[in-house]
Amino acid sequence: MKQYFIILGSVFVLLSNFAASGQKKITNETDEQKRQRMAWWTNDRFGMFIHWGLYALPARHEWVKNRERLTNEQYQVYFDQFNPDLYNPVLWAKQAKEAGMKYAVLTSKHHEGFCLFDSKYTDYKATKTQVKRDLVKEFVEAFRAEGLEVG
């Protein structure tokens, strides 16, 4: 049994070395360039991450379709009902700035594929719901108007 674990451990170490050596650097960024690029995080670390979309309608969790094994037909009701009449990114941006935030990130498309923005690649998007607007565009414009970074 001891020999089995030694062999298994050796195989694991060998394979992990191959995995590490197979990683490719995707940029030619120097350490100094990375430090400069990430300096904003040190200076502007207070921000807002908004995780919001079609999955908000069932009011349980963002993985509702997957975890509750909803069919496309069952989930369609949320697409049909989607009309965020209280969506007010101008107010959100003003409040974020007043709170001292420096940036905001919006989940523009979640795992189920619903887009809060207009896209030529799908009809599964906010512009095809009752709201008929590009919600990401409104978000970006509102936050930039307040001088906040957007992601």
Predicted regions and their residues:
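Bacterial Sec-dependent N-terminal signal peptides
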Residues: 1-24
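Mature catalytic domains of secreted/periplasmic carbohydrate-active enzymes
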Residues: 22-151
